[in-house]
A protein has these predicted regions:
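An alpha-helical interface "stripe"
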Residues: 1-170
Length: 170
């Protein structure tokens, strides 16, 4: 395990981040710096390359246009509340999304392969800045670590120094 730096009785927060990333890499997650994820703007949170790669590899019987429709559904998902949006994506991750194959037959497309875990793309990402609007004001967040499965962020991790009494959640 990575050795944490102790400076005047305090540990350096980036060491916690590096230790977590190293641990996840040993468990098979692939590290990716958030700045290297291609996206149209900082409001985008998906890793489109991984999502497209997974869907294309897992669904050879789908036309590219149908795969793009699924990607667009995930990318443009929306609902009345943030909770409803998260619930919709969660349901898609568990149950899949309805699609139509090349024979014009209905099929269910999984966003995660629960049967063969090795078919999934696991990424641990840091240095990923996200822009959003809150009450009409543009804001940014840069979580310490994000976990992606097949291009979809499934976990946001904020690491805090337990010895720092002035630590905030942001």
């Amino acid at each position: 395990m990575a050795k944490l730096k102790n400076i005047n009785g305090h540990f350096v927060e980036s060491d916690y981040e590096n230790a977590l990333i190293s641990f996840l890499e040993r468990e098979g997650w692939q590290y990716l710096c958030g700045d290297s994820i291609k996206r149209a703007n900082r409001k985008e949170v998906l890793n489109m390359e991984d999502l497209l790669q997974f869907l294309t590899k897992q669904n050879k019987d789908l036309e590219n246009s149908e795969i793009q429709r699924i990607v667009d559904n995930v990318r443009l998902v929306g609902a009345d509340t943030d909770f409803a949006t998260l619930h919709k994506v969660y349901k898609w991750m568990i149950d899949g999304i309805s699609a139509v194959n090349q024979k014009n037959e209905p099929v269910n497309v999984g966003l995660i392969d629960f049967e063969k875990i090795e078919n999934n793309i696991f990424r641990v990402v840091n240095q990923f800045t996200v822009e959003y609007i809150n009450n009409g004001v543009k804001k940014t967040r840069r979580p310490d670590v994000l976990l992606y499965v097949n291009g979809i962020p499934v976990c946001v991790i904020e690491l805090k120094n337990p010895t720092d009494a002035n630590t905030t959640i942001y």
